Structures are given as C-alpha cells and as structure tokens.
Amino acid sequence: MSVVPKDLKYSREHEWIKVDGNIGIIGITDFAQKSLGDIVFIELPGVGDEISAGDSFGVVESVKAASDLYAPVSGKVVEVNEEVIESPQLVNEDPYGKGWMIKVEISNEAELDELLSPEDYEKLLEEEGE
C-alpha cells in the first residue's frame, strides 16, 4: 500500500501539494514513483516560469516510461529542487521529502478546493488497484 500523508492535497494525476501560506510545494506521490520504477531523469521549469493547473510542467523518466508532470495549481515557480535534477533517485527514495520538485507562488487559491483530500486520494488508489 502506498504512503498517503494526511497534511497534503492530491491530484488525480498523482501529484501532491503542501501549502504553506501562498507557497505550494509540489511533487509526485509514492504511488506514482512506485508505478514508474527507477527514475533516471527529471525535467522541470525554471524559476519565474508560470504554470497553470492541469497543464504539464515537466517530465519524469524512468527505466520503464516517461510521464508528464501536471500542475495541481496555477502560479509562478519560485524555487526548483536542483537536487532531484542531479539525483533523480531521490524521488524514489523520499517522494514527500527530499524528492519534492518545485515551489510555486499560488495565484488562485480556489484551485486547492478542486484537489483531493488524503481520504479521497486513497479511494482513487483503491479504484486503480492499489
């Protein structure tokens, strides 16, 4: 069973967001990293780039597949985790900690209401056979 921290919100595309004021820290879930297998390459936007909820903001490549990353919210990228670009396996090892991807200044907090609670995300995982 995948780990689903209770202090995060989730997207149906298996991204998570931790909200701290108007800043959102975004990464992929434990389920996503397990599904991908060993991650070998990550492409992320640059600081200052604008991202839009539901749109692709990067790519994660594993030995099995390449998968787009989808923004759970809209906003401006204020920090990129350079460590995961240099050491992509951090996402496999610690998807909710050292494996975070980007930090964004959230431009529309109402979009957070569209995301899944931990309980709803667990139901989604059950539907997907987790």
Swiss-Prot record:
Where's the Lipoyl-binding domain?
Answer: 23-105
Name of protein:
Glycine cleavage system H protein
- The UniProt record lists the keyword tRNA-binding: no
Kindly give the SUPFAM superfamilies that the UniProt entry links to this protein. Answer: Single hybrid motif
Name a single GO biological process. glycine decarboxylation via glycine cleavage system
Q: How does it assemble?
A: The glycine cleavage system is composed of four proteins: P, T, L and H.
Per UniProt, which keywords does this protein have?
Answer: Lipoyl
What is this protein for, i.e. what is its function?
Answer: The glycine cleavage system catalyzes the degradation of glycine. The H protein shuttles the methylamine group of glycine from the P protein to the T protein.
Under the heading Gene3D superfamilies, the entry gives: 2.40.50.100
- Any note on cofactor binding? Binds 1 lipoyl cofactor covalently.
In which organism is this protein found?
Carboxydothermus hydrogenoformans (strain ATCC BAA-161 / DSM 6008 / Z-2901)
Q: Which CDD domains does the annotation name?
A: GCS_H
Keyword Amino-acid biosynthesis attributed: no
Modification sites for N6-lipoyllysine:
K64
Please name one Pfam family that this protein belongs to.
GCV_H
